[in-house]
Design a protein with these regions (language model features):
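Perimembrane helix-loop-helix junctions
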Residues: 1, 182-209
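Short hydrophobic/aromatic helix or loop-helix immediately within or flanking a transmembrane segment
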Residues: 59-86, 179
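Transmembrane-helix motifs of polytopic, lipid-linked glycan transferases
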Residues: 91-115
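Specific aromatic-rich, kink-prone transmembrane helix
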Residues: 106, 146-165, 306-309
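Transmembrane-helix signature of polytopic, membrane-embedded enzymes
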Residues: 108-130, 149
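Multi-pass, polyprenyl lipid-linked donor-dependent membrane glycosyltransferases
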Residues: 126, 133-152, 176, 298-299, ...
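Membrane-interface alpha helices of multi-pass inner-membrane proteins
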Residues: 152-157, 164-177, 183-189
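Hydrophobic, aromatic-rich transmembrane alpha-helices
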Residues: 251-273, 283, 309
Length: 336
């Protein structure tokens, strides 16, 4: 690598670090890290690590009954707190900063295997622009940044067909946040062909069973707080807010442009990009049924799923060749 390439790379990493600091310090301090939210965050942290619902239940605090099985980040923070004496809220803030920084770096590296540095940087710039939305409308969901890092690595490994690396990342991801249980579906849809579908089906089924076992095991071990949700009420609530706020609806602001560009780029996308679009749609449907969909923080994985096809759509608008017209890079070039 030339000296100029090192300089450009270093400056890009530095810029991503600055973005992370700005987001966490100047956006986060006025929202989820504010003094107003401090008591709620501390109470919910204690509830998770001790597996005891807070007073009034999870829903009364803007959480849900499955929060206590998203164990990796709260347990890590509790361990670091006991070992170092650093305040819990400061540790959460530090983890968010590191994870946002890592997410931007990994996102750029992933895209740069298929797209130019400028195109990859543009996608990262767009992601940075919508990051403030991920701080809004909630007080305590400390696993979403780390979950995004795990999703990025899993998507990268899935595209590169590195099954064992994908499996390792997926195992960690489901401990961070159980929505990663669907990742084997992307591995299969993105890679299976008429000649290889049996291989990828067996691999996806194997890791899927392991992830499901972990999920059910956590649910069984940490049971006692489950409350049956009315999913129809949740769907109606989400659509009512979606229609009522229109263009100002946070997911519309965050994902409207990538979705349009991904549709435009669908024809010139390769198999994995097309599978990622359908997979993103499936995730969106699940989230509309199960969560407060206006909270962009829980939908961040849609960006790396849509971005490659969206960049193909941008190329189409600019009259440049898409992914199917360019010489693809070898699938074994994954560098982590």
């Amino acid at each position: 690598m030339s000296a100029s390439a090192w300089v450009r790379g270093s400056l890009l990493v530095l810029l991503m670090g600055i973005v992370s600091i700005v987001e966490v310090t100047f956006v986060g301090d006025t929202t989820i890290y504010s003094l107003k939210a401090a008591n709620i965050r501390e109470e919910l942290h204690e509830s998770v690590v001790h597996n005891k619902p807070p007073a009034g239940g999870w829903a009364a605090h803007g959480a849900n009954d499955a929060m206590n099985i998203r164990i990796a980040i709260p347990y890590l923070v509790e361990f670091l707190h006991e070992e170092t004496g650093i305040r819990v809220l400061q540790l959460y803030k530090g983890i968010d900063l590191i994870c946002i920084w890592l997410a931007l770096i990994i996102f750029f590296a992933y895209l740069s295997e298929q797209f130019t540095s400028r195109e990859s940087a543009l996608a990262c710039l767009y992601f940075a622009a919508i990051l403030p939305l991920t701080f809004a409308l909630h007080a305590y969901h400390p696993y979403d940044r780390a979950s995004l890092v795990a999703w990025l690595l899993a998507i990268w490994c899935a595209r590169a067909r590195h099954f064992w690396k994908f499996s390792a990342v997926a195992l960690v991801a489901v401990l961070i946040k159980y929505d990663a249980i669907v990742l084997p579906g992307l591995y299969f849809l993105g890679n299976a062909t008429p000649q290889t579908w049996r291989k990828y089906l067996s691999q996806s089924f194997a890791i899927g069973i392991i992830l499901l076992t972990i999920f059910l095991g956590l649910f069984w071990l940490l049971t006692g707080s489950y409350v049956r949700e009315d999913y129809m009420d949740q769907i109606l609530r989400n659509f009512k807010m979606m229609i009522g706020t229109a263009i100002f609806y946070p997911p519309t602001l965050a994902f409207g442009l990538p979705v349009v560009l991904a549709i435009l780029g669908y024809k010139s996308s390769d198999q994995f990009m097309r599978a990622s679009i359908w997979f993103a749609g499936m995730i969106a449907v699940i989230l509309i049924v199960a969560v407060n969909f206006e909270e962009v923080r829980c939908e961040q994985m849609l960006i790396p799923l849509l971005a490659p096809a969206a960049l193909c759509g941008l190329r189409r608008i600019l009259g440049e060749p898409g992914a199917s017209q360019r010489q693809p890079r070898p699938a074994n070039t994954l560098q982590i």
